[in-house]
Amino acid sequence: MAYKTEHITQQLRAAREAQKMSQRELSARSGLTQSHISQIERGTMEPGLGSLVDVARALDLEIVLAPKKLMPAIRNILDSASASSDVLTSDQRKLVGRLERWFAQHRGGFGSASEADTFKDSLALLRHLPLSAEEMDTFNEATARLDRSQADPPSRQELSRIAHAVRHLRNAAVHRDRDDAVPRSAYALDEEDDNA
């Protein structure tokens, strides 16, 4: 039997599988039982609105009501955003993973332990902060020297420059996300100012 919410439950299942999350993990996050989630995904039970919202939020999704005439524009925005960010994030994660493996083998090449720790922390953050295409190019250029390090290991000065470039990218990504999140006005007016 096909339910009216079938297309929504199919999208929720696809989102769960894309995040490589098991039904058990989704159950723990959403507060629904695993059998309930299984029945919803198989289509043997029509979920209530509350259950749909719980599952969607556990998957970092939101259920939104939008005017039907805006749906083509919304679909285009979602498709273009997911296509570009998935490719960049995949490339970025591969590069960060490669650098983390390199770092595990060559940690002693850094001038100081604090510089090595900063480099490691920067990589850990860059695994989760999306970079623009231009920033990814800079990231690739800054770390390209490490790919050739087996035959010709980089000097401490080169490692210091690479660590500085990676830290700069990390800082740019962190501050961009923070600045985009909270719009601030150019002027602050204090309503309780008695000097007026």
From Swiss-Prot:
Q: Which SUPFAM superfamilies match?
A: lambda repressor-like DNA-binding domains
DNA-binding residue intervals: 23-42
Gene3D superfamilies per the UniProt record, alphabetical: lambda repressor-like DNA-binding domains
Entry annotated with the keyword DNA-binding: yes
Could you give a GO molecular-function term held by this entry?
Answer: DNA binding
Keyword line:
DNA-binding, Plasmid, Transcription, Transcription regulation
Q: Does the keyword Lipid metabolism apply?
A: no
Q: Where is this region: Disordered?
A: 174-196
> What InterPro entries is this protein classified in?
Bact_TransReg_Diox, Cro/C1-type_HTH, Lambda_DNA-bd_dom_sf
What domain of life does the native source organism fall in? Bacteria
Residues in domain HTH cro/C1-type?
A: 12-66
Tell me the protein's name: Uncharacterized HTH-type transcriptional regulator y4dL
Q: What is the organism field in this record?
A: Sinorhizobium fredii (strain NBRC 101917 / NGR234)
